[in-house]
Amino acid sequence: MEISEARLTHLKELEAESIHIIREVAAEFDNPVMLYSIGKDSSVMLRLALKAFYPGTPPFPLMHVDTTWKFREMIAFRDRMARESGMELIVHINQEGVEQGIGPFTHGSKVHTDVMKTQSLKQAMDQHRFDAAFGGARRDEEKSRAKERVYSFRDRHHRWDPKGQRPELWQLYNGRVHKGESMRIFPLSNWTELDVWQYIYLEDIPIVPLYYAAERPVVDRDGTLIMVDDERMPLEEGEQPRYEKVRFRTLGCYPLTGAIRSEADTLPEIIQEMLLTRTSERQGRVIDHDSAGSMEEKKRQGYF
C-alpha cells in the first residue's frame, strides 16, 4: 500500500505535535500517568511516548482501569506490551463494584460503566495522586470530544465543565492546577481514525488481533453482533452462538462492544474498508447510546 508524500508529511506533523504535548506534560506536572485502554489509539499513544523519551523509558507509568469484562485477547496483549515497553503497569479494579457483583448483564451498561470505569478511574487518580492523565481520545470520534481541549481541566471531583475550558492558542497549554485538581491530556486530539490506521501501518505498531477479521462466535442482540468471549455471557432462550467472519473497529467490555462483518484481515484492507464506511467507529459501543448526550454526561462525571 502506498501513502502519498503529502500524507506522510501530515502524519509527521501530527507525530511531532503529539510528542511535543507528551514532553510538555512530563516537564510540567509532578505525577502524570498514561491511561492504557489497550485499543489502537492507546497503542499509537504508547509508541509516541516511547519515541518522545528514546532511548530512555517514559518517566510515568501506564495505568489500565480494568472492568473485569475486557476481551481475553486484550488482557494478554496488555501484559505483553507492558513487558516490552519496560514501563510500570498499574491495573486498577473497583473492588467495591466487584463485591457488589456489578456487571453489564446484571446491572446494565449505564451502571456498569459508571461504577467499573468512571468511579474506578476516580479512585485510582485519588489513590496514586496523579495530577495529569494521558488519554487516547480524538476529536473526530464523538461530538462531546470534538469540543474538548488538549489539556482538559478536571476539578477536585474529576468533573469536566465544557463551558469552563481554558484557551489554547499557538500550542500554548495552561497546566496550572491546585492540589486535588487534575488534567486529562489528549495528545491525539487532532488525529483522525484514518491517521491512526496509517500511522500504525507505517510504524508497524502491534495491535490487538481483534481488529483483524476472523471467524468468531457471535450472537445478534438487537442488531448488534456481540462476541461470546467467555462462559459468563447468558444466552437467551433459543439463542445459539454462530461463527461469522467479523472484526472490531473499537474495543471495550465485550458485552458492550459490537463487531462488524468484514473480510479485512490485513492493515491495507482495514484502511481501504475504513475509507468506504460512512459510520462512526463508536457506532458499536453500546455505552454511547444509553441516552441523548450520553458521552458528554459521562465526561462531566469523570469519565475518560
From Swiss-Prot:
Keyword Transferase belongs to the record: yes
Keyword Protein biosynthesis found: no
Highest taxon of source: Bacteria
Alphabetical list of Pfam families matching this protein: PAPS_reduct
Reactions this protein catalyses: sulfate + ATP + H(+) = adenosine 5'-phosphosulfate + diphosphate
Signal peptide: none
CDD domains: Sulfate_adenylyltransferase_2 (cd23946)
Record's keyword terms, sorted: ATP-binding, Nucleotide-binding, Nucleotidyltransferase, Transferase
GO molecular function, one term: ATP binding
Pathway membership, UniProt: Sulfur metabolism; hydrogen sulfide biosynthesis; sulfite from sulfate: step 1/3
GO biological process, alphabetically ordered: hydrogen sulfide biosynthetic process; sulfate assimilation
EC number(s) recorded for this UniProt protein: 2.7.7.4
UniProt xrefs under InterPro entries: PAPS_reduct_dom, Rossmann-like_a/b/a_fold, SO4_adenylTrfase_ssu, Sulfate_adenylyltrnsfr_sub2
Function: With CysN forms the ATP sulfurylase (ATPS) that catalyzes the adenylation of sulfate producing adenosine 5'-phosphosulfate (APS) and diphosphate, the first enzymatic step in sulfur assimilation pathway. APS synthesis involves the formation of a high-energy phosphoric-sulfuric acid anhydride bond driven by GTP hydrolysis by CysN coupled to ATP hydrolysis by CysD.
Subunit structure: Heterodimer composed of CysD, the smaller subunit, and CysN.
Family to which this protein belongs: Belongs to the PAPS reductase family. CysD subfamily.
Protein name per Swiss-Prot or TrEMBL: Sulfate adenylyltransferase subunit 2
Gene it is expressed from: cysD
